[in-house]
Amino acid sequence: MALLDVCGAPGGQRGDWAVPLAGSRQRSDPGHYGFSLRSPELALPRGMQPTEFFRSLGGNGESKVQIEMAHGTTTLAFKFQHGVIVAVDSRASAGNYIATLKVNKVIEINPYLLGTMSGCAADCLYWERLLAKECRLYYLRNGERISVSAASKLLSNMMCQYRGMGLSMGSMICGWDKKGPGLYYVDENGTRLSGNMFSTGSGNSHAYGVMDSGYRPDLSIEEAYDLGRRAIVHATHRDSYSGGVVNMYHMKEDGWVKVESTDVSDLMHQYREASQ
């Protein structure tokens, strides 16, 4: 309530903070992901959409409270005969400002699962860390690793519960299980897609241009590394919100390995010199 006083929220907005009602279906059994009292939960005023709550802080509506965050990045992943390649840039922007060039946008969920960050960094980190916890609990309960499909479905279910609440996340979940390499795209609306190639972020159209022209399922390992590297470098060259270094991972049958972390400026100079 003190926070509401500081923010100057209207008196009518002072509802109880979100607590499951008596008789609520929310519970903490292993198969339920309702984030009830025994699980991490977002504190929200009951009966109010977060977007409406933030809008109410503007009083007469002239303060223009901005909840649509400006952000940019370039991440990509694709499957080929030797596994999955994940490549990302490392620039983090805050509106029109560059916050840092040293962000690792690949989240290491476990030795056989990787997730990428695109959108709001806080949302991606929070939900994918929560996914890592659920994957670990699955392993402890069942004695085997969770499949890539099931892990992506868990994340999709989490997003569906908070659909329309202002989250911003476009993530790729990749890994290796009994069925081989897997690659899924999940966003803040709960959309879940399986495919051989995905790219997210403000520079994804530039990355797709390179990948579409060079992708083949039968790429060799070095060809796959070069394709992912070139796609990120081209995107950072054309997209002002992407930059820094190329962080590349290779998902193999025995787990992921980090391939390289190379400055995009050095790579661009190398490509220009090679073309002359």
UniProtKB/Swiss-Prot annotation:
Known EC number: 3.4.25.1
Top-tier EC class: hydrolase
Localization in the cell: Cytoplasm; Nucleus
Site (Cleavage): 72-73
Catalytic machinery residues: 73
Residue ranges listed under propeptide: 1-72
Key words of the record: Cytoplasm, Differentiation, Hydrolase, Immunity, Nucleus, Protease, Proteasome, Threonine protease, Zymogen
Disulphide bridges: none
Record-linked InterPro entries: Ntn_hydrolases_N (IPR029055), Pept_T1A_subB (IPR000243), Proteasome_bsu_CS (IPR016050), Proteasome_sua/b (IPR001353), Proteasome_suB-type (IPR023333)
PTM text: Autocleaved. The resulting N-terminal Thr residue of the mature subunit is responsible for the nucleophile proteolytic activity.
Catalytic reaction(s) noted: Cleavage of peptide bonds with very broad specificity
Biological processes per GO annotation: fat cell differentiation; immune system process; proteasome-mediated ubiquitin-dependent protein catabolic process
Single GO cellular component term: spermatoproteasome complex
Molecular function as annotated in GO: endopeptidase activity; threonine-type endopeptidase activity
Entry keyword Nucleus: yes
Induction behaviour: Up-regulated by interferon gamma (at protein level).
Subunit structure: The 26S proteasome consists of a 20S proteasome core and two 19S regulatory subunits. The 20S proteasome core is composed of 28 subunits that are arranged in four stacked rings, resulting in a barrel-shaped structure. The two end rings are each formed by seven alpha subunits, and the two central rings are each formed by seven beta subunits. The catalytic chamber with the active sites is on the inside of the barrel. Component of the immunoproteasome, where it displaces the equivalent housekeeping subunit PSMB5.
Family the entry assigns: Belongs to the peptidase T1B family.
Function: The proteasome is a multicatalytic proteinase complex which is characterized by its ability to cleave peptides with Arg, Phe, Tyr, Leu, and Glu adjacent to the leaving group at neutral or slightly basic pH. The proteasome has an ATP-dependent proteolytic activity. This subunit is involved in antigen processing to generate class I binding peptides. May participate in the generation of spliced peptides resulting from the ligation of two separate proteasomal cleavage products that are not contiguous in the parental protein. Required for adipocyte differentiation.
Stated name of the protein: Proteasome subunit beta type-8
Species of provenance: Bos taurus
Lineage, highest ranks first: Eukaryota, Metazoa, Chordata, Craniata, Vertebrata
Gene from which this protein is expressed: PSMB8
